[in-house]
Amino acid sequence: KKRGAFLVMSNIVIGIEGYVGAGKSAICRELLNHIPNSIILEGGNLYRAIVYSLLKSGMDLSNLKQNMSHVDIKSIMEKLKITIAIENRQTAIYIDGQKIDEEKLQSAQSSLAVSEIGTIANNDKLYEFGRKLIDQFKEKYNVIVSGRALMEIYPNLDYHFMITASLDERIRRKSIQYNNKIDLEELRQNIQRRDELQEKAGYYKIYDKTIVVDVSECENVQASAKKVLSFIKKENIDNEFCE
Protein backbone atom coordinates (compact mmCIF):
# COMPACT_ATOMS: atom_id res chain seq x y z
CA LYS A 1 0.00 0.00 0.00
CA LYS A 2 1.25 3.53 -0.78
CA ARG A 3 0.63 6.42 1.56
CA GLY A 4 2.08 9.68 0.25
CA ALA A 5 5.73 9.09 -0.64
CA PHE A 6 6.07 6.12 1.70
CA LEU A 7 5.56 2.42 1.09
CA VAL A 8 3.50 0.92 3.91
CA MET A 9 3.74 -2.86 4.39
CA SER A 10 0.47 -4.73 4.71
CA ASN A 11 0.26 -7.02 7.72
CA ILE A 12 0.53 -10.72 6.91
CA VAL A 13 -1.26 -13.85 8.14
CA ILE A 14 0.84 -16.99 8.63
CA GLY A 15 -0.98 -20.29 9.12
CA ILE A 16 0.85 -23.01 11.04
CA GLU A 17 -0.65 -26.50 11.01
CA GLY A 18 1.13 -29.68 11.96
CA TYR A 19 1.05 -33.28 12.98
CA VAL A 20 0.40 -34.10 16.64
CA GLY A 21 3.57 -33.47 18.63
CA ALA A 22 5.52 -31.87 15.77
CA GLY A 23 5.91 -28.70 17.82
CA LYS A 24 3.74 -26.17 16.00
CA SER A 25 2.79 -24.25 19.16
CA ALA A 26 6.43 -23.91 20.25
CA ILE A 27 7.39 -22.83 16.74
CA CYS A 28 4.66 -20.16 16.79
CA ARG A 29 5.97 -18.78 20.08
CA GLU A 30 9.51 -18.67 18.68
CA LEU A 31 8.30 -16.87 15.54
CA LEU A 32 7.10 -14.02 17.78
CA ASN A 33 10.77 -13.25 18.44
CA HIS A 34 11.53 -12.80 14.75
CA ILE A 35 8.40 -11.34 13.15
CA PRO A 36 7.89 -7.74 14.32
CA ASN A 37 4.49 -6.59 15.56
CA SER A 38 3.16 -10.15 15.57
CA ILE A 39 0.65 -12.03 17.72
CA ILE A 40 -0.45 -15.67 17.97
CA LEU A 41 -4.03 -16.84 17.58
CA GLU A 42 -4.26 -20.39 18.98
CA GLY A 43 -7.29 -21.87 17.23
CA GLY A 44 -6.79 -25.23 18.90
CA ASN A 45 -7.06 -23.73 22.36
CA LEU A 46 -10.59 -22.52 21.64
CA TYR A 47 -11.60 -26.11 20.98
CA ARG A 48 -9.66 -27.31 24.01
CA ALA A 49 -11.46 -24.80 26.20
CA ILE A 50 -14.82 -26.08 24.98
CA VAL A 51 -13.88 -29.71 25.62
CA TYR A 52 -12.25 -28.86 28.97
CA SER A 53 -15.48 -27.18 30.09
CA LEU A 54 -17.58 -30.12 28.96
CA LEU A 55 -15.30 -32.64 30.71
CA LYS A 56 -15.25 -30.57 33.89
CA SER A 57 -19.06 -30.35 33.89
CA GLY A 58 -19.24 -34.16 33.86
CA MET A 59 -21.06 -34.24 30.54
CA ASP A 60 -21.14 -37.62 28.80
CA LEU A 61 -18.98 -36.97 25.74
CA SER A 62 -19.90 -40.28 24.11
CA ASN A 63 -23.54 -39.15 23.97
CA LEU A 64 -22.49 -35.72 22.72
CA LYS A 65 -20.32 -37.27 19.98
CA GLN A 66 -23.29 -39.25 18.63
CA ASN A 67 -25.15 -36.01 17.95
CA MET A 68 -22.17 -33.82 17.12
CA SER A 69 -22.94 -33.28 13.44
CA HIS A 70 -25.99 -31.26 14.52
CA VAL A 71 -24.19 -29.29 17.22
CA ASP A 72 -23.15 -25.69 16.58
CA ILE A 73 -19.75 -25.34 18.28
CA LYS A 74 -20.00 -21.54 18.27
CA SER A 75 -23.27 -21.66 20.25
CA ILE A 76 -21.66 -24.05 22.78
CA MET A 77 -18.82 -21.56 23.13
CA GLU A 78 -21.32 -18.79 23.91
CA LYS A 79 -23.26 -20.91 26.41
CA LEU A 80 -20.05 -21.82 28.26
CA LYS A 81 -19.08 -18.10 28.25
CA ILE A 82 -15.76 -18.80 26.55
CA THR A 83 -13.94 -15.67 25.43
CA ILE A 84 -10.60 -15.02 23.77
CA ALA A 85 -8.10 -12.23 24.44
CA ILE A 86 -4.55 -11.36 23.39
CA GLU A 87 -2.15 -11.04 26.35
CA ASN A 88 1.61 -10.70 25.95
CA ARG A 89 1.07 -11.25 22.20
CA GLN A 90 -0.45 -14.70 22.79
CA THR A 91 -3.94 -16.16 23.05
CA ALA A 92 -5.56 -16.17 26.48
CA ILE A 93 -8.75 -18.18 27.01
CA TYR A 94 -11.35 -17.28 29.62
CA ILE A 95 -14.25 -19.45 30.76
CA ASP A 96 -16.95 -17.47 32.56
CA GLY A 97 -14.40 -14.75 33.35
CA GLN A 98 -11.74 -17.14 34.67
CA LYS A 99 -8.47 -17.57 32.78
CA ILE A 100 -7.59 -21.21 32.01
CA ASP A 101 -3.92 -22.12 32.09
CA GLU A 102 -2.17 -23.82 29.18
CA GLU A 103 -1.38 -27.04 31.07
CA LYS A 104 -5.06 -27.81 31.64
CA LEU A 105 -5.91 -27.07 28.01
CA GLN A 106 -3.05 -29.23 26.72
CA SER A 107 -3.73 -32.31 28.89
CA ALA A 108 -3.64 -35.67 27.11
CA GLN A 109 -7.29 -36.35 28.00
CA SER A 110 -8.49 -33.04 26.55
CA SER A 111 -6.31 -33.39 23.43
CA LEU A 112 -7.75 -36.77 22.43
CA ALA A 113 -11.32 -35.61 23.09
CA VAL A 114 -10.67 -32.49 20.99
CA SER A 115 -9.52 -34.65 18.07
CA GLU A 116 -12.59 -36.88 18.36
CA ILE A 117 -15.10 -34.03 18.59
CA GLY A 118 -13.37 -31.76 16.08
CA THR A 119 -13.62 -34.35 13.30
CA ILE A 120 -17.41 -34.70 13.49
CA ALA A 121 -18.69 -31.33 14.72
CA ASN A 122 -20.43 -28.75 12.58
CA ASN A 123 -17.68 -26.12 12.49
CA ASP A 124 -19.10 -23.66 9.95
CA LYS A 125 -20.03 -20.91 12.42
CA LEU A 126 -16.80 -21.39 14.38
CA TYR A 127 -14.83 -21.00 11.14
CA GLU A 128 -16.76 -17.82 10.36
CA PHE A 129 -15.95 -16.53 13.85
CA GLY A 130 -12.26 -17.37 13.30
CA ARG A 131 -12.24 -15.57 9.95
CA LYS A 132 -13.63 -12.38 11.50
CA LEU A 133 -11.19 -12.63 14.41
CA ILE A 134 -8.20 -12.89 12.05
CA ASP A 135 -9.42 -9.94 9.97
CA GLN A 136 -9.91 -7.91 13.14
CA PHE A 137 -6.38 -8.51 14.42
CA LYS A 138 -4.74 -8.21 10.99
CA GLU A 139 -5.66 -4.52 10.94
CA LYS A 140 -3.08 -3.92 13.69
CA TYR A 141 -0.74 -6.94 13.71
CA ASN A 142 1.04 -9.60 11.74
CA VAL A 143 -1.02 -12.65 12.72
CA ILE A 144 0.42 -16.12 13.33
CA VAL A 145 -2.45 -18.62 13.41
CA SER A 146 -2.01 -22.09 14.88
CA GLY A 147 -4.74 -24.69 14.40
CA ARG A 148 -6.48 -27.07 12.00
CA ALA A 149 -8.23 -26.54 8.65
CA LEU A 150 -6.71 -23.07 8.40
CA MET A 151 -7.11 -22.87 4.62
CA GLU A 152 -10.84 -23.46 5.07
CA ILE A 153 -11.06 -20.86 7.81
CA TYR A 154 -8.90 -18.28 6.03
CA PRO A 155 -8.17 -19.08 2.36
CA ASN A 156 -6.21 -15.82 1.92
CA LEU A 157 -3.35 -16.88 4.18
CA ASP A 158 -0.08 -15.30 3.04
CA TYR A 159 1.76 -18.45 4.11
CA HIS A 160 0.48 -21.92 4.98
CA PHE A 161 2.91 -24.29 6.70
CA MET A 162 2.43 -27.96 7.55
CA ILE A 163 4.91 -29.03 10.24
CA THR A 164 5.87 -32.71 10.19
CA ALA A 165 8.24 -34.97 12.13
CA SER A 166 8.79 -38.70 12.48
CA LEU A 167 6.48 -40.60 14.85
CA ASP A 168 9.36 -41.43 17.23
CA GLU A 169 10.41 -37.79 17.39
CA ARG A 170 6.83 -36.67 18.05
CA ILE A 171 6.50 -39.22 20.87
CA ARG A 172 9.75 -37.92 22.37
CA ARG A 173 8.56 -34.32 22.25
CA LYS A 174 5.14 -35.12 23.73
CA SER A 175 6.79 -37.08 26.53
CA ILE A 176 8.85 -34.01 27.43
CA GLN A 177 5.72 -31.82 27.27
CA TYR A 178 3.97 -34.11 29.77
CA ASN A 179 7.09 -34.20 32.01
CA ASN A 180 7.67 -37.90 31.23
CA LYS A 181 4.59 -38.78 33.30
CA ILE A 182 2.85 -40.80 30.57
CA ASP A 183 3.93 -44.26 29.44
CA LEU A 184 5.61 -44.11 26.01
CA GLU A 185 3.43 -46.86 24.55
CA GLU A 186 0.31 -45.06 25.76
CA LEU A 187 1.64 -41.88 24.14
CA ARG A 188 2.30 -43.74 20.89
CA GLN A 189 -1.27 -45.08 20.79
CA ASN A 190 -2.67 -41.65 21.69
CA ILE A 191 -0.72 -39.92 18.88
CA GLN A 192 -1.56 -42.60 16.32
CA ARG A 193 -5.24 -42.41 17.24
CA ARG A 194 -5.22 -38.62 16.89
CA ASP A 195 -3.37 -38.91 13.56
CA GLU A 196 -6.09 -41.24 12.27
CA LEU A 197 -8.83 -38.86 13.37
CA GLN A 198 -7.09 -35.82 11.84
CA GLU A 199 -6.49 -37.60 8.53
CA LYS A 200 -10.09 -38.85 8.43
CA ALA A 201 -11.29 -35.27 8.85
CA GLY A 202 -8.95 -34.03 6.11
CA TYR A 203 -6.98 -31.85 8.52
CA TYR A 204 -3.59 -32.82 7.05
CA LYS A 205 -4.59 -31.70 3.57
CA ILE A 206 -1.84 -30.19 1.42
CA TYR A 207 -2.83 -27.24 -0.79
CA ASP A 208 -0.99 -25.56 -3.66
CA LYS A 209 0.34 -22.86 -1.33
CA THR A 210 1.20 -25.28 1.51
CA ILE A 211 4.87 -25.46 2.50
CA VAL A 212 5.69 -28.76 4.21
CA VAL A 213 8.48 -28.42 6.79
CA ASP A 214 9.98 -31.58 8.33
CA VAL A 215 11.57 -30.75 11.70
CA SER A 216 12.62 -34.30 12.67
CA GLU A 217 16.31 -33.39 12.52
CA CYS A 218 16.01 -29.98 14.16
CA GLU A 219 17.84 -29.95 17.49
CA ASN A 220 15.62 -27.33 19.10
CA VAL A 221 12.68 -25.02 18.49
CA GLN A 222 14.99 -22.24 17.30
CA ALA A 223 16.22 -24.48 14.48
CA SER A 224 12.63 -25.44 13.61
CA ALA A 225 11.56 -21.79 13.51
CA LYS A 226 14.57 -20.87 11.37
CA LYS A 227 13.51 -23.50 8.85
CA VAL A 228 10.03 -21.97 8.69
CA LEU A 229 11.40 -18.42 8.45
CA SER A 230 13.58 -19.37 5.48
CA PHE A 231 10.37 -19.42 3.38
CA ILE A 232 9.09 -16.03 4.54
CA LYS A 233 9.98 -12.84 2.69
CA LYS A 234 12.83 -10.99 4.37
CA GLU A 235 10.87 -7.73 4.72
CA ASN A 236 8.54 -9.50 7.17
CA ILE A 237 11.35 -10.75 9.42
CA ASP A 238 13.57 -9.09 12.01
CA ASN A 239 16.74 -8.20 10.08
CA GLU A 240 19.08 -9.61 12.73
CA PHE A 241 17.71 -13.10 12.14
CA CYS A 242 18.48 -12.94 8.43
CA GLU A 243 22.19 -12.20 8.83
Range-by-range predicted roles:
Residues 16:
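Hydrophobic anchor at the beta1->P-loop junction of P-loop NTPases
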Residues 24:
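Conserved lysine of the Walker
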Residues 27:
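Hydrophobic positions on the alpha1 helix immediately C-terminal to the Walker A/P-loop
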Residues 34-106:
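N-terminal phosphate/diphosphate-binding loop that engages ATP/GTP or pyrophosphate donors
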Residues 76, 85-90, 127-139, 147-157, ...:
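Small-molecule kinase domains that catalyze NTP-dependent phosphoryl transfer to phosphate-bearing small molecules
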Residues 95, 100-179:
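ATP-dependent NMP and nucleoside kinases share a basic, alpha-helical "lid"
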